[in-house]
Structure formats: C-alpha cells, structure tokens
From Swiss-Prot:
<keyword id="KW-0946">Virion</keyword>
<keyword id="KW-0687">Ribonucleoprotein</keyword>
<keyword id="KW-0167">Capsid protein</keyword>
<feature type="modified residue" description="N-acetylserine; by host">
    <location>
        <position position="2"/>
    </location>
</feature>
<keyword id="KW-1142">T=3 icosahedral capsid protein</keyword>
<dbReference type="GO" id="GO:0019013">
    <property type="term" value="C:viral nucleocapsid"/>
</dbReference>
<keyword id="KW-0543">Viral nucleoprotein</keyword>
<dbReference type="GO" id="GO:0039617">
    <property type="term" value="C:T=3 icosahedral viral capsid"/>
</dbReference>
<feature type="region of interest" description="Disordered">
    <location>
        <begin position="1"/>
        <end position="24"/>
    </location>
</feature>
<comment type="similarity">
    <text>Belongs to the alphamovirus/ilarvirus capsid protein family.</text>
</comment>
<dbReference type="GO" id="GO:1990904">
    <property type="term" value="C:ribonucleoprotein complex"/>
</dbReference>
<protein>
    <recommendedName>
        <fullName>Capsid protein</fullName>
    </recommendedName>
</protein>
<dbReference type="GO" id="GO:0003723">
    <property type="term" value="F:RNA binding"/>
</dbReference>
<keyword id="KW-0007">Acetylation</keyword>
<keyword id="KW-0694">RNA-binding</keyword>
<comment type="function">
    <text>Capsid protein. Binds to the to the 3' end of the nonpolyadenylated viral RNA and is involved in viral RNA translation initiation. Probably binds RNA and plays a role in packaging.</text>
</comment>
Amino acid sequence: MSSSQKKAGGKAGKPTKRSQNYAALRKARLPKPPALKVPVAKPTNTILPQTGCVWQSLGTPLSLSSFNGLGVRFLYSFLKDFAGPRILEEDLIYRMVFSITPSHAGTFCLTDDVTTEDGRAVAHGNPMQEFPHGAFHANEKFGFELVFTAPTHAGMQNQNFKHSYAVALCLDFDAQPEGSKNPSYRFNEVWVERKAFPRAGPLRSLITVGLLDEADDLDRH
C-alpha cells in the first residue's frame, strides 16, 4: 500500500514528536485571553423606579479577593451610544450606584480619572470630593455612587453621540482585621440611572476587573 493510499484509507498513525512540538508551538503563539473576564448581563428594569429615570442593572454579583493583601482594582466602564433629531449631551444625567458588601471595614479611593474616549476629564480625585462634572457620594443604602452630567458641546444637535466613560476604583485593604489573609469585597450590583429624552437609544455596558500587582498602584489618586 502506497503512502497516498495509507492517507486515504488507512488508519491514522500516532502523532510524531515533530507534529506534537509544532502543535505546542502553535498553541503557545495564540493570543492569550484576559486573565479575568466578567460576563455582562443585559440591562433590565430594577426594583428602584424613579419618575423620569431609567434604572438598569448592568452586572451580576461579583466577588473580588486580594490574594496579595494589597487591594483590588475595579474598573467599570460604559458606553452611551444614541441618536436623535435634537438630543443634547447636556440633557443627559447619569448616576452610577455601586452596591458593595465588604468583608471588613475598608476604605475606597479613586485611582484614575473618569474620562471620555477622547481623553476629556469628566471627574477625578477622591470619592468624597466634588468634581467639575460629577461627584462621589457615600450612599448608606448601596455603598457609594458617582453622579455626573455629561459634558455639553455647543451646536452638536442633530448628530450621533458616542462616548465612553470609565471609573477605576481601588479598594484599599489597609484596614483589614488582623489575621485576615484574603479580604474581599462583593459587588452586588452596579446600577445606572439615566435621565434623558425618551427617544434616547440603548446603553451598552462593559465591566472589566483587574487585580493590583504593586503596592504603588494604591497611591495613585
């Protein structure tokens, strides 16, 4: 039986060392997926309706633990993408409410600015400070919240707006109780209150999470 006949009708032989090495090399060259990927739930109406507002649940319960004892960096970002005949960004008010159950008494600190996709600052600083376009407030019922109005652009009527906003929050575990090796925070849900024209389009959301690698990252304010 010729080699071609063997390939056509014969049984497949065992993979050679060379083919195994090639397969391993090919697998190693494939792009690695993100270390941690959080599924995003479709927006749904919640039990917190308010007149003139749209409440949406943008995530499922999420538990984060610090394996190095330093802290956890939580990055929440969302993209508002809508179109309308006369929609102004100044007519949009967003309120993000983070519902958190800590495993112990800790502190929150904002590590990065809240910026639009083209780099314009929306909010920055400490969670308890006022911002140019927004403010962090302690919320006894939910944890803490960010309230801001989208920046205004003169003469931008009759256009499609697409901006992304991100909030990077650092959970500082300095206040962890003695003997606690892996403190954690549970993000019960992230809510967004959107107040805009009824014809405003959908709100698409993305939640990403990353752990802090170095203690220096905790000092970024």
